[in-house]
Amino acid sequence: DIDTPVFSKRSGVTVDNAYETSFKLIDDLKADYGMSTEVAAGFVGNLWHETGGFKYMQEIRPLVKGSKGGLGFAQWTGKRRDNFESYLKKEGKEDTASYDANYGFLKKELDTTESRVLKKLEGISNIKDATKVVSETYLIPSKKYAKIDERIEAAEDILKRYNEDRSLTDEDN
């Protein structure tokens, strides 16, 4: 359950599963794409915003009447949702909320159809610019619902907690 507090696997500090997901995403984006911690946190802050802190993997009130709405970490809609569902079927994954399913599809997109966001992130070193680039290039929400300040706030909060978690872990070593 994502609302149940847990001990951080790294530092022993109590965090909820949503932050554990955030920290894992940062680590994976850094490892797979060479992103700085700040840029990765900007990416994750957007996904946090899209899902209400990784609580809602299915869009609650779809904006497009009659549509299935967004699904997954990036609230993929339309053709991208169809591609996510096809990916799940092909990979034999049934849980649309699982980390492996969502990160696997995110990675597939970044390696292929959505690689332009990685190019735009090159040379960016601050969290605000990274958050804006991911929102405007990868997620592309309607202007009415973009709420970039909330995305940046989420990214900054995640970065702060990530750095605190990692510094506590480093002190233990």
List the model feature ranges, each with a label.
Residues 50-51, 110-114, 138, 142, ...:
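A generic secondary-structure signal for well-formed alpha-helical elements
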Residues 3-27, 32, 51-126:
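Peptidoglycan-targeting cell-wall enzymes and recognition modules
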Residues 35-36, 94, 165:
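Short coil/loop linkers at secondary-structure junctions
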Residues 40-44, 70-73, 103, 131:
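Extracellular structured ligand-interaction cores
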